[in-house]
Regions:
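Small/polar-rich, solvent-exposed N-terminal microdomains that initiate assembly or binding
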Residues: 1-58, 78, 82, 98
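Charge-dense, low-complexity intrinsically disordered segments
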Residues: 3-4, 74, 118-121
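Generic helix-packing signal
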Residues: 14, 84, 88-91
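Residue-level signal for beta-strand positions within conserved beta-sheet cores that form or flank
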Residues: 41, 66, 101
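Short, surface-exposed linear patches
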Residues: 51, 65-69, 90-95
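Short, solvent-exposed beta-strand/turn "edge" segments of beta-rich domains on protein surfaces
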Residues: 57-61, 119-122
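Oligomerization/assembly interface segments of phage tail-like spikes and tubes
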Residues: 62-80, 87, 123-136
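Acidic-leaning, charged glycine-interspersed low-complexity segments
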Residues: 89-140
Length: 140
């Protein structure tokens, strides 16, 4: 019996988004080497608090209900919405976690509002969406 780690789940989400042709940041916006501006458009993945683990008497922590946030970033509001829609479509197509079966990837808050971030140069627009991913061990 062991808790299921977040690494494999986070990597599966990131790889799914990259597989859809999106530029993806892991916990922070991607930036060109040695430069400060954000690569746009892009998506940033954050594993967040919440969710739960459950299971059987034999392995009480084998089922995972993980929560994560997708932040879509664009140069204009419409681009942020477009990237958010592309990320949603990629996730709806399914996520593969090594050694696990993913029952569902579900939006919790599918239409995040778009906001302008003036704290970066040049300013960008971003939209956040909350998601959950439910997985359990593959059958032997």
């Amino acid at each position: 019996m062991a808790l299921v780690g977040a690494y494999a789940h986070a990597q599966a989400i990131i790889e799914t988004l990259k597989g859809a042709g999106l530029v993806v940041g892991d916990g922070e916006a991607p930036r060109p080497a040695g430069r400060s501006e954000i690569i746009t458009p892009c998506v940033v993945v954050h594993m967040i608090d919440g969710g739960m683990v459950d299971g059987t008497l034999a392995d009480p922590d084998e089922w995972v209900d993980a929560r994560f946030q997708i932040t879509a970033v664009g140069r204009v509001a419409a681009e942020a919405r477009d990237i958010a829609d592309k990320a949603s479509a990629a996730l709806a197509g399914g996520v593969t976690v090594a050694g696990r079966r993913v029952m569902r990837v579900q939006p919790i808050d599918p239409w995040g509002r778009v906001e302008r971030d003036n704290d970066v140069t040049p300013p960008v627009y971003y939209s956040t969406q909350l998601w959950r991913l439910f997985s359990f061990p593959e059958a032997p």
